Amino acid sequence: NPGWDDFWIELQVRLEYLKKLTRDHFREWVESIEVSKVKPVLDLPDTASFITFNYTPTLEYVYGVRPDRILHIHGCVLDKNQLLQFGSPDNNPFELQKMLEEKYGMDDFYGATIQQGVTVACDRCADAWKNIEGNYDALNHFLDSLAKIDTVIIMGNSFDKVDKPYYRDVLAPRYRDAEWVFCEYESNEDKQYD
């Protein structure tokens, strides 16, 4: 029927900018960050390993850390084929799909028009989703490759809601007997690390 596709086509056109923003433009911006001119300010041990939430090759280029000692948990611009994970864990496309299907799934027009709109909305939601639990396998694989860890040093991480699950679900249980050192750029005495 003519016009039945208008809804989801319009939705796709209006939301297409999200894909360009979170994939193309974000990568272009990160690639434009000039790390080769950065001077090292830390003396990092050769035996140290790193989990970085930074998309840039700062550890590799500025500090000479071997790539096998680094896990770029959300991707690195050095790998042109790797998707840089940009967004929030709150943008879960599977939860959105479930909610929309529960709300509109019984509608007479669901199969004819609404379902395609749900698919478009969920695809764009995925473009702005940081799948934290989906990164656990890579994180555990990296950690399994390391020697015994006696000290965990946290630098430059805000411990916000986005990254908290990594600590709660993987790092804290695994390294509960290690010494934990927290380095903050600006002290925030009100902050609590649960």
PLM feature segments, named:
Residues L71-H74, P93-L96, R174-D177:
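Short, surface-exposed linear patches
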Residues L78-K80, D177-Y193:
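Short, flexible loop segments at boundaries between secondary-structure elements
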Residues R66-D68, N91, K98-M99:
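A two-mode feature
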